[in-house]
Amino acid sequence: MRVTDFSFELPESLIAHYPQPERSRCRLLSLEGPTGALTHGTFTDLLDKLNPGDLLVFNNTRVIPARLFGRKASGGKIEVLVERMLDDKRILAHIRASKAPKPGTELLLGDDESIHATMTARHGALFEVEFNDPRPVLDILNAIGHMPLPPYIDRPDEDADRELYQTVYSEKPGAVAAPTAGLHFDEPLLAALREKGVEMAFVTLHVGAGTFQPVRVDTIEDHIMHSEYAEVPQEVVDAVLAAKARGNRVIAVGTTSVRSLESAAQAAKSDLIEPFFGDTQIFIYPGYQYKVIDALITNFHLPESTLIMLVSAFAGYQHTMNAYKTAVEQKYRFFSYGDAMFITYNPQAISERP
């Protein structure tokens, strides 16, 4: 399959640069996987689409202020984007500079250049940086870091993004991008879903900066997926197995929840799904056999991205591309701060190719 098979025309005007004033008032395009039928509505329509006993699986990662500005002690400007926190003193990061720093390079970080750090090692495209500061890394990032808005949101981050670019249930700091399908859930909607009898469970996948990297090969089978840390604890496994046993659906909120659950299913030795704690490089594209999820809530993704490939593997290629064409025609808002889709599984998708 070719990467260009997953391309579509998107006017710049449809890229959302700010979220809706009210989280749950975004538009919702529902795609019936088996038939391809499309329905237009709003996000709160989920109350009608979900049944008592259905299980929603959320990603409770929390976005860290992962973008740092500063300079090398020798003078050159740098931009640091944290990929992951290694411990209380060290980070693994992408560094943008006119000349890549060498191990031992001293860095002065923060808008006032008050934080001292040292680049200690290089691991491929990533740099290991150690802070010379008594505070834990997370405290330093909260003090001097900027929210890492995606590259297609063409504006500086604002104070409001510290909350707007978080899900209301975010709990575990470590992501450099929000699991954006979850941004549409507010407390009233969550309460109404609970009242209806919808079950909820929480995985953790710390979204890395690699999620924004373009696919740089022509043939998608040649793509090497970036690695991200995921946790699927025992209580999630129990909730999934219980939902399946009673004939209810497992509904992933976002592609990161999909990748967490399917990673846990791939690693399972005896049951449908077993607890999973570790890095995952799972790459889901047409031909993949889904094992766990029955429905998916997700935003609209970039052309030629691994995420539109994941959706195509779930709903079927033709149904997915037709839904995106319709979304453009109907002027849905795209990407992280944009509108959402509710998709049910298409069992025929596994045998469909572009």
Curated annotation (Swiss-Prot):
Q: In which pathway does it act?
A: tRNA modification; tRNA-queuosine biosynthesis
Cellular component GO terms, alphabetically?
cytoplasm
Q: What EC number(s) has UniProt assigned to this enzyme?
A: 2.4.99.17
Keyword S-adenosyl-L-methionine tagged: yes
InterPro entries, sorted: QueA, QueA_dom1, QueA_dom2, QueA_sf
Q: Does the keyword Cytoplasm apply?
A: yes
UniProt catalytic activity: 7-aminomethyl-7-carbaguanosine(34) in tRNA + S-adenosyl-L-methionine = epoxyqueuosine(34) in tRNA + adenine + L-methionine + 2 H(+)
Keywords, A to Z, come to: Cytoplasm, Queuosine biosynthesis, S-adenosyl-L-methionine, Transferase
Q: Molecular function (GO) terms listed?
A: S-adenosylmethionine:tRNA ribosyltransferase-isomerase activity
Compartments, as annotated in UniProt: Cytoplasm
- TM spans (from-to): none
Q: Which GO terms describe its biological process?
A: queuosine biosynthetic process; tRNA wobble guanine modification
List, alphabetically, the Pfam families matched: Queuosine_synth (PF02547)
Alphabetized SUPFAM superfamilies for the sequence: QueA-like
The residue range of the signal peptide is none
Subunit structure and binding partners: Monomer.
Assigned protein family: Belongs to the QueA family.
- Please name the HAMAP family in this protein's record: QueA (MF_00113)
What is this protein's function per UniProt?
Transfers and isomerizes the ribose moiety from AdoMet to the 7-aminomethyl group of 7-deazaguanine (preQ1-tRNA) to give epoxyqueuosine (oQ-tRNA).
Stated name of the protein: S-adenosylmethionine:tRNA ribosyltransferase-isomerase
Upper lineage: Bacteria, Pseudomonadati, Pseudomonadota, Gammaproteobacteria, Enterobacterales
From the UniProt record, report the name of the gene that encodes this protein.
queA
